[in-house]
Swiss-Prot record:
It comes from the Archaea. Residues 20-22, 54-57 are annotated as: Interaction with DNA. GO terms for cellular component: chromosome; cytoplasm. This is Archaeal histone B.
Amino acid sequence: MAELPIAPVDRLIRKAGAQRVSEQAAKLLAEHLEEKALEIARKAVDLAKHAGRKTVKAEDIKLAIRS
């Protein structure tokens, strides 16, 4: 189950042009977004560790997104 709130995901789908959004659709997208965010976060943590830091910086996130 996704930890991301469903309401903001619903708003994103509506912002993309949907007039109505089923709860199941919003939940499914929230789960996918969370999986992708965790993947990026893990890469960013690895990059910070490789740089000898405990703190994840914006540059780590940017690099993780690109890779």
